[in-house]
Curated annotation (Swiss-Prot):
E.C. no: 4.1.99.22
UniProt remark on cofactor binding: Binds 2 [4Fe-4S] clusters. Binds 1 [4Fe-4S] cluster coordinated with 3 cysteines and an exchangeable S-adenosyl-L-methionine and 1 [4Fe-4S] cluster coordinated with 3 cysteines and the GTP-derived substrate.
Region: Disordered, residue numbers: 1-30
Pathway annotation: Cofactor biosynthesis; molybdopterin biosynthesis
PROSITE patterns tied to this protein: MOAA_NIFB_PQQE (PS01305), RADICAL_SAM (PS51918)
Enzyme class: lyase
Assembly, per entry: Monomer and homodimer.
Source superkingdom: Bacteria
Residues given in the record as GTP binding sites: 43, 94, 125, 186, 293-295
Cell membrane listed as a keyword: no
Catalyzed reactions: GTP + AH2 + S-adenosyl-L-methionine = (8S)-3',8-cyclo-7,8-dihydroguanosine 5'-triphosphate + 5'-deoxyadenosine + L-methionine + A + H(+)
MF GO annotations: 4 iron, 4 sulfur cluster binding; cyclic pyranopterin monophosphate synthase activity; GTP 3',8'-cyclase activity; GTP binding; metal ion binding; S-adenosyl-L-methionine binding
Protein name, UniProt field: GTP 3',8-cyclase
Amino acid sequence: MTVTALGLPTVARSTGDGSAGASPAPADGPLVDTYGRAATDLRVSLTDRCNLRCTYCMPAEGLNWLPGDALLSPTELARLLRIAVARLGITSVRFTGGEPLVVRHLEEVVAAAAALEPRPEITLTTNGLGLARRAEGLKKAGLNRINVSLDSVDAAHFARITRRDRLPDVLAGLAAAKAAGLEPVKVNAVLDPVSGLDDAVELLRYCLQHGYQLRIIEQMPLDASHSWQRDNVIDADRILQTLQQHFELTPDSRPRGSAPAELWQVAEGPTHAAGTVGVIASVSHAFCSACDRTRLTADGQIRSCLFSREETDLRHLLRGGADDAEIEAAWRAAMWSKPAGHGINDPDFVQPVRPMSAIGG
């Protein structure tokens, strides 16, 4: 079995006068690009700071963090969320980092999103440190569900990958999220080239035993050191081949839609319950044609793609007195020029300057 490639958009970009490529972005309606894709999923990075130092993300000494006055205030962020939902048709908001749990006003931000009309689905991606004591409060604030990044349930492997000996804290956070009703609890894993395939098997077994849904993600070129190499990526086909040696997998029959993960049903076994596992083949089997995301960084920049090399500055507009219509127009223009695909496999691909920790997952 192999994953299915969704490929690049089939809606051609025109280039002549009066064409889609030459015309301005629509002034209303869905938040579309020139390839016909509509963005309904907003990814919001709340901070570039993180309390782990994962080897594929940032160096051991950390990075130069954004200064406090560069970050959007809760009031500024609430305004952009309102514009996104009320004027641009956003139906889902995911808060990310860096690590969003280091943000003290996280519950306030979640509550502001939950108060919007129409109310969007509100989700969070976190490394799980501190989640055990905040899961209940986040649920009360309006959080619907959660994704926890966890690359290994082997303590030594976890410490090597994250440069922190904190696996018990993450596992406690997962349990607290489930107890708080932030379900389905999903686990996001990026496989380490050294131990990743073994880790994938044990992760899936652990998730099935505890009622979590595992998503395994191909490592992407978003590390701060720009040392990513395609040859080191454990691709989706190898992941599936390995899992099939230990579990009985069948393709999930539900339409995939714009979801990045291709799902597989896992049959019950002697050591685990039945469940699902997803594989996100970001590199080897692009799904850019179905992308429905728009991204807002912690310092107020709009990115149309994880791998964009251009950004649109909404913070400047916010602080310069722009009205909602002007901000909406800038956001629409940013998304209108979204590229056809991420370009990772192009010979002239250039990694974005911002690392993943400063963009948000």
